């Protein structure tokens, strides 16, 4: 593109690395889209195309981590123009990394799509672990934080008229997408767990270990305060 002098000014400069990362991100968010970045200042050129979409995105984010399950991904389009795509994978770390997008725009503060995802994720996994007997007598029900420990996830929604909390679009507030994300995540994740018992066991074990560690830490704090 040719930048506008009126918008960018005479002393405009473009950071190659910033453009590289954003175009790579867009290729993950739009499966099959081919993007070429050519920097005529130094001759650098990069081609971006992801046939795997969000599944490849999650694999990329976890490339330096030891993963627990194969990437889980689904895409659901509704009759009223909304679409939900999600991919997730657990690794053996203790940090959560969940990225949220609306119409290819990143929301650093999440919003209604993230809220629906978290609710469905916790409910689906706790119901599964209870039904399959992973939770033993005396075990506390794992919290949302326990469930998301070591989770890498990407949520991408498409909305015809999205609403955000501010002009920077850092948080999605469109309430109509929350039940769609929640319903579809619960359904597809439950199917994945039932169809992949080996990986489901690995995920359940990590979550229960996180829950027990949290409870042990709480009891240790209480003992310290009593002394």
Q: What do the PLM-derived regions correspond to, one by one?
A:
Residues 1-227:
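GHKL-family ATPase ATP-binding module
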């Amino acid at each position: 593109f040719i930048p506008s002098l009126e918008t960018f000014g005479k002393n405009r400069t473009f950071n190659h690395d910033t453009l590289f990362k954003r175009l790579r991100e867009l290729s993950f968010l739009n499966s099959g889209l081919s993007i070429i970045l050519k920097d005529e200042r130094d001759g650098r050129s990069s081609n971006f195309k992801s046939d795997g979409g969000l599944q490849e995105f999650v694999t990329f984010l976890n490339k330096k981590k030891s993963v627990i399950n194969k990437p889980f991904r689904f895409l659901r389009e509704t009759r009223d123009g909304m679409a939900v795509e999600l991919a997730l994978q657990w690794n053996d770390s203790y940090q959560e990394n969940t990225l949220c997008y609306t119409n290819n725009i990143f929301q650093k503060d999440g919003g209604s799509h993230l809220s629906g995802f978290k609710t469905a994720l916790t409910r689906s996994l706790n119901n599964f672990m209870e039904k399959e007997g992973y939770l033993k007598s005396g075990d506390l029900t794992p919290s949302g934080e326990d469930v998301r420990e070591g989770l890498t996830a990407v949520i991408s929604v498409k909305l015809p008229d999205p609403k955000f909390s501010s002009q920077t679009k850092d948080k999605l507030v469109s309430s109509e997408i929350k039940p769609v994300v929640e319903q579809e995540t619960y359904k597809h994740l439950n199917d994945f767990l039932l169809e992949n018992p080996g990986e489901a066991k690995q995920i359940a074990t990590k979550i229960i270990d996180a829950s027990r560690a949290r409870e042990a830490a709480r009891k240790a704090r209480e003992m310290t305060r009593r002394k």
